[in-house]
C-alpha cells in the first residue's frame, strides 16, 4: 500500500486531469514546448483562461516553464506525466468502442495483409 502522502499527491494529479481543457493542454504539450498563445489557439480558449489552467498544472508539477523575453513556454514535466496523459487518452479510446486512433494504422495494415492473402 502506498504511503498516505503519495496517495494524496495522486489524488491531486487526478484532480488536475478532471478538467477537459487541462487534458487538452497536456495532450498538445506531448508534441513539445509551446508558448501560452499557441496553447490557447490549439485548445480554442482565451490566453487568460489558459494561463490559469497552466498555473494549476505547474503547481501540481505536471508542467514546467521557461521564460524567453516576454513569453513563457510550457512543457511536460517528466516522462511519467507524458505516460499518464497518453494512457488516459488511450484508455478512453479503448473504452469508447471501435478501433482506437492509435491503432488505426495497425488496423489498416492488417486489413491490407488480409486482402493480399485472398
Where are these regions (language model features)?
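Intrinsic low-complexity/disordered segments
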Residues: 49-50, 68, 105-106
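Residue-level detector of secondary-structure transition/capping positions
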Residues: 33-34, 58, 89
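Beta-hairpin "wing" of winged helix-turn-helix
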Residues: 58-68, 75
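N-terminal helix-turn-helix DNA-binding core of bacterial DNA-binding proteins
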Residues: 8-48, 72-80
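Amphipathic alpha-helical dimerization/coiled-coil segments
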Residues: 1-9, 80-118
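Residues within the DNA-recognition helix of helix-turn-helix
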Residues: 53
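Alpha-helical and His/Cys-centered functional microenvironments
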Residues: 56-57, 75, 98, 107
